Amino acid sequence: MYRRSVGVLFVGRNTRWISSTIRCGTSATRPIRSNALNTDSDNASVRVPVGNSTEVENATSQLTGTSGKRRKGNRKRITEFKDALNLGPSFADFVSGKASKMILDPLEKARQNTEEAKKLPRWLKVPIPKGTNYHKLKGDVKELGLSTVCEEARCPNIGECWGGKDKSKATATIMLLGDTCTRGCRFCSVKTNRTPSKPDPMEPENTAEAIKRWGLGYVVLTTVDRDDLVDGGANHLAETVRKIKQKAPNTLVETLSGDFRGDLKMVDIMAQCGLDVYAHNLETVESLTPHVRDRRATYRQSLSVLERAKATVPSLITKTSIMLGLGETDEQITQTLKDLRNIQCDVVTFGQYMRPTKRHMKVVEYVKPEKFDYWKERALEMGFLYCASGPLVRSSYKAGEAFIENVLKKRNMK
């Protein structure tokens, strides 16, 4: 029985493909015939031992005059090809079904032993998003041409936030100023470009219309960083808040915005536009900031943004979020919490960093739920108004927003 057919192409005068069929598991020789070689006979043949690639090369070089350098290169390729065939599954493996279990890629075994290839811990697994409210929100977002950070950032909580039975308890985080950021933080999956498209002038109106349709009790507006705009998009975001308050006056509005390159006048515009919660994320501890965030975003600059918002409108709830699993230490997290309390930040959230793609920075550690509980207790002990802490918690997390909503409603009743 024959199972392999090998073709050899000789370069020279009057050349054609010369083929030989090789019997598996034997050292027998078979003739290689050609009708195109410049030999004394039209039916010239050379007997070549199949199992020895060196003898194959020597025999063929006599017919073609192949140079020593070319012979060496051909010999190496034939040897590599032969080795690859020998390492691969045999016909018997295919018949028995063992072939599917064999590792053909030599790098695959190495990948299987890396931390990234291991299965996620059970506490990081979530159900597939579904439900009437989920599909309703998803349809409206598409119809009105809006972007949501829930989708763009691949948030694991989208099913929980969008799919609640009570529509007034559902939460959506709408991303304004387009879906392309001018910065390139190493943890973020949002698209980046130095010159994104111009902001949609109808976006504030369309966003307000969507919020009115959904009847949400709480909405989060976030933006990509727009360093290409003079005001960083502050006026566009502020106008959106005002439109929402006009069309859905009972909806509480949180904005999660950037640092506006440290321009505190833009922070003033945002703080005074009528929003209820001013959020800006530190993302990580000070020592890791240069490695995690874009070089234009600094730890101290972010603290100054939160501090200025609180100073401008003291009744505002200020909020930030920190990712765990990036290699931070307990001492560094404690110092970060102290820095936040020194500027009177009200709310902090802790969540597990999860690598969006292989192009992003690796996860250093999957932090256990018990550790998240510990940081929640520490934050409350230090005087934070609220702390949402858990592996799947994100800055705009439904449970945290429900608490803030109740706090704000009580304030309004007074």
From Swiss-Prot:
Binds 2 [4Fe-4S] clusters per subunit. One cluster is coordinated with 3 cysteines and an exchangeable S-adenosyl-L-methionine. One of its GO terms (molecular function) is metal ion binding. Pathway: Protein modification; protein lipoylation via endogenous pathway; protein N(6)-(lipoyl)lysine from octanoyl-[acyl-carrier-protein]: step 2/2. The keyword 4Fe-4S applies. InterPro entries: Aldolase_TIM, Elp3/MiaA/NifB-like_rSAM, LIAS_N, Lipoyl_synth, rSAM. GO terms for biological process: lipoate biosynthetic process. Keywords: 4Fe-4S, Iron, Iron-sulfur, Metal-binding, Mitochondrion, S-adenosyl-L-methionine, Transferase, Transit peptide. [4Fe-4S] cluster 1 binds at residues 150, 155, 161, 396. [4Fe-4S] cluster 2 binds at residues 181, 185, 188. Its main location: mitochondrion. It comes from the Eukaryota. The keyword Metal-binding applies. CDD domains: Radical_SAM. Transmembrane segments: none annotated. Residues 51-75 are annotated as: Disordered. Its EC number is 2.8.1.8. Present with 1630 molecules/cell in log phase SD medium. This is Lipoyl synthase, mitochondrial.
